[in-house]
């Protein structure tokens, strides 16, 4: 899988996406991740990529020209399944969406910045707008990093244990059940006996019951009638 991220602050996410599991995925050739400095595609003497909005609105707006140039250039190199814009206006990013996007081959993620982007970019260049929550960040870099991490860990071979991703919280719209490791008892705090029993069917039943209970208690909005 290849993900191209367009940003004015590549250094903000470079270290985050070059370490741990995502870094190893790149080293093993399972994920190709490219960060593109949008300012490199500006023809302005000062490499500006924003300007004042028409109509007297406050703030600055990302210009259409440099964004069009870089997306057009990238599309001459390969076909892209989606051109994503990180925006609080977009559809909410969740685990099913991460699953869906992980099955694709090539993605472009455009990081929003300033007051917003020239609306023509949304009309003619963007195929999907995605939000990671109902709040506003300084820019879309953190949102792009969150989405990339969530998507990349689902690529076959990225995690040593594929079952780990399949049992994550939000798969099947349930929170994950409690997990424990050694020692079995610490300061009087015991691991549930069922997990030490070795009875796989009973353990699976317990885990499902715990997942349902935790979801009802902590995220009742996930429970469908």
From Swiss-Prot:
Gene Ontology CC, one term: cytosol
Top-level taxon in the UniProt lineage: Bacteria
Binding site for S-adenosyl-L-methionine: 112, 132-137
Any one Pfam family match given in the protein's UniProt record, by short name: tRNA_m1G_MT
Enzyme Commission number(s) from the entry: 2.1.1.228
Molecular function in Gene Ontology: tRNA (guanine(37)-N1)-methyltransferase activity
Subcellular location as annotated: Cytoplasm
Protein family membership: Belongs to the RNA methyltransferase TrmD family.
The protein's assembly and partners: Homodimer.
Protein's name in the database: tRNA (guanine-N(1)-)-methyltransferase
Encoding gene, per UniProt annotation: trmD
């Amino acid at each position: 899988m290849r993900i191209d991220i367009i940003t004015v602050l590549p250094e903000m996410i470079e270290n985050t996406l070059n370490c741990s599991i995502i870094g190893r995925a790149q080293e093993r050739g399972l994920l190709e991740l490219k960060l593109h400095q949008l300012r490199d595609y500006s023809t302005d003497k000062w490499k500006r990529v924003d300007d004042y909005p028409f109509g007297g609105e406050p703030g600055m707006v990302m210009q259409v020209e440099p964004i069009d140039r870089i997306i057009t250039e990238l599309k001459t190199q390969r076909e892209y399944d989606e051109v994503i814009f990180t925006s609080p206006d977009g559809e909410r990013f969740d685990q099913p969406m991460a699953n869906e996007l992980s099955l694709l081959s090539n993605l472009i993620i455009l990081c929003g910045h300033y007051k917003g982007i020239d609306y023509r970019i949304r009309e003619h260049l963007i195929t999907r707008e995605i939000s990671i929550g109902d709040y506003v960040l300084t820019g879309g870099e953190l949102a792009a990093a969150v989405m990339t991490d969530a998507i990349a860990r689902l690529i076959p071979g990225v995690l040593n244990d594929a079952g780990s991703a399949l049992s994550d919280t939000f798969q099947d719209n349930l929170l994950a059940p409690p997990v424990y490791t050694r020692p079995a008892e610490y300061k009087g705090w015991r691991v549930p006996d069922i997990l030490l029993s070795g009875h796989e069917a009973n353990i699976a039943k317990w885990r499902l019951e715990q997942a349902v209970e935790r979801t009802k208690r902590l995220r009742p909005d996930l429970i469908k009638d």
